[in-house]
Curated annotation (Swiss-Prot):
It is found in: Secreted. GO terms for biological process: neuropeptide signaling pathway. Keywords: Amidation, Neuropeptide, Secreted. This is FMRFamide-like neuropeptide GGNDFMRF-amide. FMRFamides and FMRFamide-like peptides are neuropeptides. In larvae, expressed in the CNS and thoracic perisymapthetic organs (tPSO) but not in the ring gland or abdominal perisymapthetic organs (aPSO) (at protein level). In adults, expressed in brain and thoracic-abdominal ganglion but not in corpora cardiaca and corpora allata (at protein level). The modification Phenylalanine amide is found at residue 8. The keyword Thylakoid does not apply. It comes from Delia radicum.
Amino acid sequence: GGNDFMRF
């Protein structure tokens, strides 16, 4: 749960 900024 959180920001998916570093999801590739």
